Amino acid sequence: MKEAIKWTANHMPKSGDQQLPVMSLPNVAKARFFHSSFPQYSITPLAQLDGMAKYLGLGGLFVKNEAHRFGLNAFKVLGGSFAMARYIAQEMGRDVSEMTYDYLTSEAFRQEFGQATFFTATDG
């Protein structure tokens, strides 16, 4: 027997979220360009879940398994690495699109930026 999908409407008032500009299409393109500059980057394939799609009455259902992104057992690396690149670009008065893997691992970058230590955390 199929169980009905449960959902709840969001009745919270819309507000001016000051962080939304970071999700604009130009900024998303910069994030994609940044991550694709890494030699370890590869497109994560979609897994097709035919049985679940049929059970839910959908024509198709696809998911991405980001657990092995960049050879790591975590998917959160994308946000952390891009946040660091944005911070570095801001500190240097440059655009994040200039912060490629090759540049960030170069001696020229080390000479110009110096040293920094970054910490990231996860609840998982």
Predicted regions and their residues:
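PLP-dependent amino-acid enzyme catalytic core
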Residues: 1-123
